[in-house]
Amino acid sequence: MSFVPEKVFFTKGVGRHKEYLSSFELALRDAKIEKCNLVTVSSIFPPKCERLSVEEGLKRLSPGEITFAVMARNSTNEHNRLIASSIGVALPADESLYGYLSEHHPYGQTSEQSGEYAEDLAATMLATTLGIEFDPNKDWDEREGIYKMSGKIINSFNITQSAEGEDGLWTTVIACAVLLP
């Protein structure tokens, strides 16, 4: 049996609680996907996969459903510790080809830094599979221009959640690409 997702939506959340597991549950609730049995998968954006809004995607989920997702997750119980979770996305111009989703879960990076890193990672993985020549030592903005000017990569973006740890609590952040039939 083959299952290639045809739809995807992106969501994120943050949770805080005195218990580690409960902070994760609250992050799932914030992302509105707590009712699913999540199965994490690796990072391929399926060919011809349609992006849905969070609201449209949630309508397709049922409580207890086995749900596939690419998830970036990070937690801390350190006061003022900055954490982030990002999903980077890179899509080919040719929709019959697959794209990439990357997960990044750093400490000490802002949302912008984490998101840019994840997006860069996804775009670089896609560029190497498409045979786009580039200098990996150039900064992201320059490589992004090369990738898009090649005509082979049409879009890249990220979804990121960051937060600072609070005294006496676990803080968990998640970013997810939820894959649907």
Curated annotation (Swiss-Prot):
A Gene Ontology biological process noted in the UniProt record is: arginine catabolic process
Per its UniProt record, the required cofactor names are: pyruvate
Molecular functions per Gene Ontology: arginine decarboxylase activity
The record's free-text note on cofactor binding: Binds 1 pyruvoyl group covalently per subunit.
Q: Which InterPro entries match?
A: Pyr-dep_his/arg-deCO2ase, Pyr-dep_his/arg-deCO2ase_sand, Pyruvoyl-dep_arg_deCO2ase
Q: Name the UniProt key words of this record, in alphabetical order.
A: Decarboxylase, Lyase, Pyruvate
Q: Which residues carry this modification: Pyruvic acid (Ser)?
A: 43
Q: Where is the site described as Cleavage (non-hydrolytic) found in this chain? A: 42-43
Question: Would I find Nucleus among this entry's keywords?
Answer: no
Q: For this protein, what is the EC number?
A: 4.1.1.19
Reactions listed under catalytic activity: L-arginine + H(+) = agmatine + CO2
Alphabetical list of HAMAP family matching this protein: PvlArgDC
Which family does the record assign? Belongs to the PdaD family.
Entry-linked NCBIfam families: pyruvoyl-dependent arginine decarboxylase
Q: What is this protein called?
A: Probable pyruvoyl-dependent arginine decarboxylase
